[in-house]
């Protein structure tokens, strides 16, 4: 467990700066007020990256799907999305089991992971299919479902006597 924690801690260190000992409250306050790192330190350059870039077409498609109008400043949105994708890829760099999309798949699938239920219409529910599923049901003893018929219930007779009071 310690080795996992140690390796995780090593991955979180972004620079090898040494800081002087902070002794007073004012020194600590001043130190915390200054930004000592930038998210840009963690981002790889988009030119050396093998990831697909977010194209203006994808931005327009996302805006259309979200119900927003086309923006006049598509460039800034595209740049922001590219930076976010680079940062997310940085977070998952240590995960060697990530699946890379095959070239035959849609370009958007490599960028946005959609659940099948989000974009594929389901078959409509029909009465015939429901009746077929009901007929195919079998009782499962592991769930406490016991197989019995109506004749099993009718075998035991119950008599209720009403008393007149």
UniProtKB/Swiss-Prot annotation:
One of its GO terms (biological process) is mitochondrial translation. GO terms for cellular component: glutamyl-tRNA(Gln) amidotransferase complex; mitochondrial inner membrane. It holds the Pfam family GatF. This is Glutamyl-tRNA(Gln) amidotransferase subunit F, mitochondrial. It is found in: Mitochondrion inner membrane. The keyword Membrane applies. It comes from Candida albicans (strain SC5314 / ATCC MYA-2876). Its EC number is 6.3.5.-. It catalyses: L-glutamyl-tRNA(Gln) + L-glutamine + ATP + H2O = L-glutaminyl-tRNA(Gln) + L-glutamate + ADP + phosphate + H(+). Allows the formation of correctly charged Gln-tRNA(Gln) through the transamidation of misacylated Glu-tRNA(Gln) in the mitochondria. The reaction takes place in the presence of glutamine and ATP through an activated gamma-phospho-Glu-tRNA(Gln). Required for proper protein synthesis within the mitochondrion. It is a peripheral membrane protein. The gene is GTF1.
